[in-house]
Amino acid sequence: MAKESMKAREIKRAKLVAKYAEKRAALKQIVRTGDPAEAFEAAQKLQELPKNSNPIRMHNRCKLTGRPKGYIRQFGVSRIQFREMASNGLIPGVKKASW
């Protein structure tokens, strides 16, 4: 399992991304379409935003264990937890393949 501090860090990043999403999108739009002077100012303001408010810095982690690798997006858990939950019948509609 991942350390609690790593899980907390990811939660904090998610909150920052949500908080600054609109502001970041507006500034990026100005950088793309504005005249050079406005674009430069918008780029400066983008750099002043917190680093962790950038969605690129987020990493998918298992909701149960915090494991960063082997993440299954559709279910939000790692492959290990997915297999365990599917075997126990905790995920509706999932069963072992047979052909």
Swiss-Prot record:
Gene3D superfamilies per UniProt: 1.10.287.1480
Keywords: Ribonucleoprotein, Ribosomal protein, RNA-binding, rRNA-binding
SUPFAM superfamilies reported in the protein's UniProt record: Glucocorticoid receptor-like (DNA-binding domain)
InterPro entries assigned: Ribosomal_uS14, Ribosomal_uS14_bac/plastid, Ribosomal_uS14_CS
BP terms from Gene Ontology: translation
One Gene Ontology molecular-function label: structural constituent of ribosome
One Pfam family, short name: Ribosomal_S14
GO cellular component: cytoplasm; small ribosomal subunit
Function: Binds 16S rRNA, required for the assembly of 30S particles and may also be responsible for determining the conformation of the 16S rRNA at the A site.
Subunit: Part of the 30S ribosomal subunit. Contacts proteins S3 and S10.
Family per similarity comment: Belongs to the universal ribosomal protein uS14 family.
HAMAP family xref list: Ribosomal_uS14_1 (MF_00537)
Name of the protein described by the UniProt record: Small ribosomal subunit protein uS14
Protein species of origin: Bacteroides fragilis (strain ATCC 25285 / DSM 2151 / CCUG 4856 / JCM 11019 / LMG 10263 / NCTC 9343 / Onslow / VPI 2553 / EN-2)
